[in-house]
UniProtKB/Swiss-Prot annotation:
Keyword terms, alphabetized: Cell inner membrane, Cell membrane, GTP-binding, Hydrolase, Membrane, Nucleotide-binding, Protein biosynthesis
InterPro entries: EF-4, EFG_III/V, EFG_V-like, EFTu-like_2, G_TR_CS, GUFP, LepA_C_sf, LepA_CTD
Gene: lepA
Lineage: Bacteria, Bacillati, Cyanobacteriota, Cyanophyceae, Synechococcales
Residue pairs linked by disulfide bridges in the UniProt entry: none
A cellular component annotation (GO) from this entry: plasma membrane
Species this chain originates from: Synechococcus sp. (strain JA-3-3Ab) (Cyanobacteria bacterium Yellowstone A-Prime)
Reaction catalysis annotation: GTP + H2O = GDP + phosphate + H(+)
Primary residence: membrane
Family per similarity comment: Belongs to the TRAFAC class translation factor GTPase superfamily. Classic translation factor GTPase family. LepA subfamily.
A Pfam cross-reference name: LepA_C
Superkingdom, taxonomy of origin: Bacteria
SUPFAM superfamilies: EF-G C-terminal domain-like (SSF54980), P-loop containing nucleoside triphosphate hydrolases (SSF52540)
Protein name: Elongation factor 4
CDD domains on file: EF4_II, EF4_III, LepA, lepA_C
Residue span(s) of domain tr-type G: 7-189
Length: 603
């Protein structure tokens, strides 16, 4: 079926906020075109990671090729490139959109436009895609398609005269959607004669065939056995297998401009086949790569340590395997006196961090200790040089630096207007600066704030959801760095600094954070044979302290009557012993203590 002319190929993706029915719609399209038989059909067919099904989110990109006979009697090939809808995976979305000519904008008829939808629509508009609005879930009792159409026109500025009303669950509107894709999405440019340029929009590691690269052929043609070159890394390989996804892989002899398929070429690591990179032929190279390739930059860092130090090698292997599939994951070895050997890992955002952590625990049976997430600070030293600090324990002392700058994000929240007050208050407590506020149709509002990323990564999202009873949605983008009065807060247990508990906080908040941290640790660290002081300090100045009293045996149990000096002697002896113990004893800090610090509300 590879002999379809370029004019009858349509490449499209589906843009939607989480839970607006994107995966279900994809399932219906696969069914309606007969790509998947009823026997193979299962809900959310393209979400093939166990974790994706469970959380109901799409993490990794999937692609599927469908054959469709349109009403004009012609056979078309429709390539659906599924996109993740979550804020952390924006780069994945952007490069999958770059592989398309059109997009279905799916909006829930009862919920309306959400913040994440907006962010992805702007990405689609940047890539000049034809956008087809689809109002989904019209079968719900609370559906208000007219209101939602008005909202899309008002908020995004799209013409919705051709919007399609649908219900993916009930199968309503599916034929109209397929026709709209054929009629309204432009075909790819016919550049089969040009030198090969293929855009990598995803890759995953197969233990038998090496890395399988998902590509959209932009120009030229590629055949099995061709020698190819990756333009960003300069590496060369020979193609062992070419194919298309229906959504199960099916080998073909060649792929030409406009088509979407996969390439296997015995590639050892996803590192070598970076997403967004351009593939070209060795003997006929393209003059320049496709635009838009960016190195994925980690924004949130944390330490991962095996709770049992014997598992260090397994953790390393597991991270390397995940890295094969996840180019945005970054890690380097780290040693912590409190936690032993582990890794410092960088992630795109909080959800990405949780997903990686859960996959490590689930798929590789590891038991992990995770330190508090931190962001990357820019520190200007006395000599004028700037360093990037992703770990609070590496922050230079105050006398060696002139300023600390923290990353600032622009947060856009869409919410019902009755919650505006409480959300504005939340943003103020998180050191936010108010930027903009717009009233939308039907009592909804958008709020725009600039907030320090450090405040967003802890528990901002949870608090936002609880303050708005789950009705708010948010999206954030980096806007740059800004200097502020930041200090490093150290936690000392029994006089020793526990580096994994150090955090960088704003000076105004240091006292409150320190006080609540030591109070929390006091509850969680078990009592020892000697008393254990827990202190929060900025530099050498202690700002909060709690003491865990010692466990004591009743040494007076065997003295019935007798002289008080006898009792005193025994008590003194016990006290001496405790003192000696304290000098040499070490304090066990349980994992719960680290996790509690992580979850601590910055009230």
């Amino acid at each position: 079926m590879t002999d379809v002319p370029v004019s009858r190929i349509r490449n499209f993706s589906i843009i939607a906020h989480i839970d607006h029915g994107k995966s279900t719609l994809a399932d219906r399209l696969l069914e309606a075109t007969g790509t998947v038989s009823a026997r193979e059909m299962k809900p959310q067919l393209l979400d093939n990671m166990e974790l994706e099904r469970e959380r109901g989110i799409t993490i990794k990109l999937q692609a599927a090729r469908m054959n469709y006979r349109a009403q004009d009697g012609q056979d078309y090939v429709l390539n659906l490139i599924d996109t993740p809808g979550h804020v952390d995976f924006t780069y994945e979305v952007s490069r999958s959109l770059a592989a398309c000519e059109g997009a279905l904008l799916v909006v829930d008829a009862s919920q309306g436009v959400e913040a994440q939808t907006l962010a992805n629509v702007y990405l689609a508009l940047e890539n000049n895609l034809e956008i087809i609005p689809v109002i989904n879930k019209i079968d719900l009792p609370g559906a208000e398609p007219e209101r939602v159409i008005a909202e899309i026109e008002q908020v995004i500025g799209l013409d919705c005269s051709g919007a399609i009303l649908a219900s993916a669950k009930m199968g309503i509107g599916i034929p109209e959607i397929l026709e709209a894709i054929v009629q309204r999405v432009p075909p790819p440019r016919d550049t089969v004669a040009d030198p090969l340029r293929a855009l990598i929009f995803d890759s995953y590691y197969d233990s038998y065939r090496g890395v399988i690269v998902y590509v959209r052929i932009m120009d030229g043609e590629v055949k099995t056995g061709d020698k190819i070159c990756f333009m960003a890394s300069g590496r060369e390989y020979e193609i062992t297998e070419l194919g298309v996804m229906r959504p199960h892989q099916e080998s073909v002899a060649s792929l030409h401009a406009g088509e979407v398929g996969y390439i296997a070429a015995a590639i050892k690591s996803v590192e070598h086949a970076r997403v967004g990179d351009t593939i070209t032929l060795v003997h006929r190279k393209a003059s320049e790569p496709l635009p838009g390739y960016k190195e994925a930059k980690p924004m949130v860092f944390c330490g991962l340590f095996p709770s049992n130090s014997d598992q260090y090698a397994e953790l390393k292997e597991a991270l390397e395997k995940l890295k094969l599939n996840d180019a945005a994951l970054y890690f380097e070895p780290e040693v912590s006196p409190a936690m032993g050997f582990g890794f410092r890992c960088g992630f795109l955002g909080l959800l990405h961090m949780e997903v990686v952590q859960e996959r490590l625990e689930r798929e590789y049976n590891l038991d992990l200790v995770i330190t508090a997430p931190t962001v990357v600070y820019q520190v200007t030293l006395n000599d004028g040089s700037v360093i990037r600090v992703d770990n609070p324990s590496k922050l230079p002392p105050p006398n060696e630096r002139t300023s600390i700058e923290e990353p600032i994000v622009r947060v856009e929240v869409i919410l019902p207007e009755e919650f505006v007050g409480t959300v504005m208050e939340l943003c103020e407590t998180k050191r936010g600066t108010f930027k903009d506020m717009k009233y939308l149709a039907q009592g909804r509002t958008t709020l725009v704030y600039e907030l320090p990323l450090a405040e967003v990564v802890t528990d901002f999202f949870d608090q936002l959801k609880s303050r708005t009873r789950g009705y708010a949605s948010m999206d954030y983008q980096m806007v740059g760095y800004r200097a502020d009065d930041l200090v490093r807060l150290d936690i000392l247990i029994n006089g020793d600094v526990v580096d994994s508990l150090s955090t960088i906080v704003h000076r105004d908040k240091a006292f409150y954070v320190g006080r609540s941290l030591v109070a929390k640790l006091r509850e969680l660290i078990p009592r020892h044979q000697f008393e254990v002081p827990i202190q929060a300090a900025i530099g050498s100045r202690v700002i909060a302290r709690e003491t865990i009293p010692a466990l004591r045996k009743n040494v007076l149990a065997k003295c019935y009557g007798g002289d008080v000096t006898r009792k005193r002697k025994l008590l003194e002896k016990q006290k001496e012993g405790k003192k000696r113990m304290k000098a040499v004893g070490t304090v066990e800090v349980p994992q719960e203590a680290f996790m509690a610090v992580l979850k601590l509300q910055n009230d």
